[in-house]
Amino acid sequence: MNILIIGGGAAGIAAAKSACARGCKVAVVDRKPRLGGVLLQCSHPGFGANRTGTEYADSLLESFPKEAAFIPNTTVLSVEKTKIARLSGGRELAFSCLILATGCREIPAGALPIAGTRPQGIYTAGQMQEMMNLHGIIPPGPVVILGSGDIGLIMADQIAALDIPVTLV
């Protein structure tokens, strides 16, 4: 059986591992260049055994089946009733079974309750995590965080640890 998994985060990796263990041929497609999903941008502990998201992602990657194909930097554009997936770049993949493991994302930047067009220097928490934890870009400060939920508090803690003034609203 050919299984197509859309999404290379924790759920996609677990699905690939399980399917390969049952003798299935597996392809995992993800829009990012690396497996791991949102875990890759999570530098805070809390993923079991006091591991960060990145450390947890690394442990998942170690268990990613060598026989599974990973197709990075690719988006599934459409899935046909004939069980053909059309991918960005013009490629097509036939499959017997489809697993959607696309995870979740925060509210799109344009949907945030900020008046006017989005000026430079305003980011979502996810964008900020990606900038800081994946690309090493540190805000010059001071930083104002709109929202004091879990992610806002995590970001405030991370920014304050760098001695950058931070305010939660």
Language-model regions: role of each:
Residues N2-S59, P140-V169:
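Beta1-alpha1 glycine-rich phosphate/pyrophosphate-binding loop at the start
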Residues M1-I6, A57-P142:
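FAD-binding core/adjacent interface of flavoenzyme oxidoreductases
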